[in-house]
Structures are given as C-alpha cells and as structure tokens.
C-alpha cells in the first residue's frame, strides 16, 4: 500500500510489498499452497521478512533467505499471533520517527537511527545493553555525504512519518518505524503504544527535541483531564 491508496493524495511514504496470512487460512490451504502463494505475491523474491501481524519487541520476526526456511518462520510467527505478514526485506537506514499531536497540529520529533552492533535489531538485541547504538537525531552522514542533501532527506523522512500518522488517523502520539532505502521512506510499522522505558525510542526522540518525557506525558494527560 502507498499513502495515496489511503488518502487519494500523492505522498513520499510507501510500504514493502507483502502478504497477510491468517492462521486459519494457512491451515486450510495447506503449507505447500500457502508457500506458493507467498512466493507469487511477494515481488522481488527473497529475502523476506516474516512477522506476527500484531505485537512488539520484534517477537516472532524473522529474516528468511530461502523458501526452505519460510514454513518454519511462518509457524513461529503464528505462535505469537493469529496472523502473519510476509513482506519484502528492505535494506537501508533503520529509523523510528515519533509523532506528537493530532491532525494538522501533529509534528514529528527528530528521527532516531538504529544501528545493531551485529545481526538484526531483534528481540535479544533490544533487551541486551550495548547491543544497539541509537543516534538521536539520525546522523547526516547516514543519509548523504552532502550535508544539504542530508537535511532535505531528513525533512522528507519526517514528512513521510506525518503522512502515515495522519492517514491512519492516529492521535496524541505514535512511533512510525521505517527504513530509508536511499530513495524513499519504507514504512513497516505504526506503533500507537510505543515503549516508554529509559532505553526506548520515544524517550530518546523527546530528548533530541529538547523535551522531557514527563512533560510530554503530563501535557497529554492534562488535555483529557480538562
């Protein structure tokens, strides 16, 4: 799906091509047919990402390099949810863009760049101190060798996050997870309940914007206490 598919307008955000597969459908059509369907629908071939349709902390998320490992990855992802999403694997600069506000008053906080020290940004890496480096805001050199171009790309990334946020009618706060692939922002998750722990991405974005997490949350609470 693209932003314009949701709103009828042209946008700069896109989603990787993918397949939604429910557990009942997987059982009903059989593993062999389901695997054939996935290979037919996911444009670009392997590698693909397999993940639960709902969840967090990368539980049940797999990078699958060949059809031989696809069935096992789907079964594992289905152990965390009633459905899975299989989509193109996208390489690039991984970021999280937090958004505050509602409607046209919403605004993006500085993108947080995510750099695993080794392997993927999976469950273990998220929980292990020192396994991931976070840069808030994203380093200009990660986007372009030219500083001016890097600033323009960052602005486009923030605009893409806002487009998605508004297209989904999100309100108050959310975190848009995406990858900059060198040409566009490829969105792979909209998290309307982002983590608030000390090492979480949303507090890092607040700090990069010069905001304290407590002041942001107090402001949100006060809006609904009036």
Describe the predicted segments one by one:
Residues 45-47, 94-96, 175, 187:
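Broad gene-expression machinery/nucleic-acid interaction feature
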Residues 62-152, 156-159, 180, 186:
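Phosphate-binding site of ATP-dependent enzymes
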Residues 20, 26-28, 96, 184, ...:
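Short Asp/Glu-rich motifs
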Residues 58, 134-135, 197-202:
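Short small-residue beta-strand/loop micro-motif enriched in glycine and branched aliphatics
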Residues 146-226:
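ATP-dependent carboxylate activation and anion-phosphoryl transfer catalytic cores
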Residues 1-92:
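Active-site nucleotide/adenylate-binding loops and adjacent lid/helix of ATP-dependent enzymes
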Residues 21-24, 55, 114-117, 129, ...:
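Active-site/binding-pocket entry motifs
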């Amino acid at each position: 799906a693209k932003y314009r598919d949701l709103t009828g307008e042209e946008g700069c955000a896109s989603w990787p091509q993918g397949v939604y597969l429910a557990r009942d459908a997987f059982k009903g059509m059989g593993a062999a047919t389901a695997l054939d369907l996935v290979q037919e629908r996911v444009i670009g071939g392997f590698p693909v990402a397999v993940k639960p349709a709902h969840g967090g902390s990368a539980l049940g998320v797999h990078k699958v390099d060949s059809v031989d490992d696809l069935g096992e990855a789907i079964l594992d992802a289905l152990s965390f949810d009633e459905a899975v999403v299989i989509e193109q694997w996208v390489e690039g600069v991984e970021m999280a863009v937090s958004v505050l506000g509602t409607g046209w008053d919403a605004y993006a906080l500085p993108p947080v760049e995510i750099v695993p020290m080794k392997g993927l940004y999976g469950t273990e890496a998220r929980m292990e101190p020192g396994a991931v480096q976070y840069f808030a805001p994203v380093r200009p050199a990660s986007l372009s060798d030219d500083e001016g171009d890097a600033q323009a790309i960052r602005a486009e990334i923030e605009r893409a996050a806002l487009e998605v946020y508004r297209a989904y009618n999100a309100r108050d706060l959310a975190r848009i997870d995406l990858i900059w692939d060198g040409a566009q922002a490829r969105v792979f998750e909209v998290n309307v309940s982002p983590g608030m722990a000390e090492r979480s991405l949303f507090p890092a974005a607040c700090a990069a914007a010069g905001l304290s997490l407590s002041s942001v949350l107090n402001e949100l609470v006060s809006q609904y206490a009036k």
